[in-house]
Amino acid sequence: ALVVWLAFTSAVIAGESPTVEDQMAGLVAMCAESEQARAQRHAETPLYDRLGGSEKITAMTAEIIRLHSINPDFRRFWGEIDEERLIKNVSDFVSTGTGGPKVYEGRDMPSAHAHLELSAADFLSAGGDVMHAMQNKGYGENEIQEMVCILVSMKDQVITK
């Protein structure tokens, strides 16, 4: 994930502007190429454990939500969000999806995101917040890549425009 992000950042600095479609295609390709390595790491130690368990996942989620709350791309709907509830639901979702014991009881991804009318650019912006939050919390490239690829696997469920 960091390699792809740095490649796109370098392209922008060099005066090139990768399109949203190019960035999405790059993420999909990265996730496809790393699928076996990610599965092997998860089989050895579930991502839940490598993320540090429930408390650290909640702290990471709170940082993601904090970054979303100050992200200008999300101002248009942030006022209607209950941050505490969102942190709990996302933490439970991440815990469940990474091999932890929590049971996610929230809405499915299409239902939870449909009213937000997210574009591919919004998706990339949210993914950037996830990567920065994980870096802020000290996670390594493997864990960041795995979280990004989990998000990429759900892109068709949340991108609606």
What is each model feature region?
Residues 15-161:
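Core of compact, soluble alpha-helical bundle domains
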Residues 1-11:
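Bacterial N-terminal signal peptides
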